[in-house]
């Protein structure tokens, strides 16, 4: 999950390096290379974890039954909703990040570096979660993380909407808030995913697919309108 959180933030830096050396067309070639490497690695190095007696047939009826079981579980439904809202917040920031860095805060030349720095700083969230999850429990950590995000975003909203920040502090305040969003993601998403799969070990593949697909789709439906509301300020993202 740490890799999952960090990759979207580090990706602009990787893309910038590819474009610098081989041009924008090289990005599409990179997709092909990465897909081949990933699929080859899984095929050659990743064994099947389920024992033979627990494996299901790859048939339509079996898949449909597993999907119904997953989607009918109330805990899975609630966790998926929370993940959609959390992903929506992160996707909304990602969709407007370049405009905010370039147009609002005039950091276009350093955008990949700032974004990579944001990813590295927020990665401490996954380390912190790994340290305390057994002591505090997944649910408690998730609740604490979201309350922290409410407080940080609330303070940021007061400062921005009240025009209380001097010019010199506007970008540092935004950067701190953006790091807090990714930090929250690092703390919560792994726990939420584990909570969704907690009682679905026998259909873990289908459960992971359903939770991931539904939460991502919900996040896109949240983030897309927010991105369209961009007005040259950070206000629409804060409201979201």
What are these regions (language model features)?
Residues 140-191:
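C-terminal transmembrane helical hairpin of 12-TM major facilitator-type secondary transporters
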């Amino acid at each position: 999950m740490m890799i999952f959180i960090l990759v979207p933030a580090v990706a602009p830096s990787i893309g910038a390096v590819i474009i610098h050396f081989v041009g924008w067309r090289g990005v599409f070639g990179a997709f092909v290379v990465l897909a081949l490497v990933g699929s080859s690695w899984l095929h050659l190095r990743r064994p099947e974890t389920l024992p033979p007696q627990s494996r299901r047939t790859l048939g339509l009826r079996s898949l449909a039954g597993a999907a119904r079981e997953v989607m009918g579980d109330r805990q899975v439904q609630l966790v998926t909703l929370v993940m959609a809202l959390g992903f929506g917040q992160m996707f909304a920031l990602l969709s407007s990040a370049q405009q905010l860095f370039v147009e609002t805060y005039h950091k276009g030349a350093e955008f990949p570096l700032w974004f990579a720095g944001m990813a590295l700083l927020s990665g401490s969230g996954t380390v912190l979660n790994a340290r305390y999850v057994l002591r505090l429990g997944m649910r408690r950590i998730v609740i604490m993380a979201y309350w922290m995000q409410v407080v940080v975003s609330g303070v940021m909203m007061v400062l921005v909407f009240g025009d209380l920040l001097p010019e010199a502090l506007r970008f540092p305040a935004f950067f701190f808030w953006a790091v807090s969003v990714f930090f929250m993601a690092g703390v919560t998403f792994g726990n939420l995913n584990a909570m969704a799969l907690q009682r679905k070990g026998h259909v873990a593949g289908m459960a992971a697919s359903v939770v991931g697909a539904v939460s991502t789709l919900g996040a896109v439906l949240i983030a897309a309108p927010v991105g369209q509301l961009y007005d040259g300020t950070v206000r629409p993202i804060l409201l979201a």
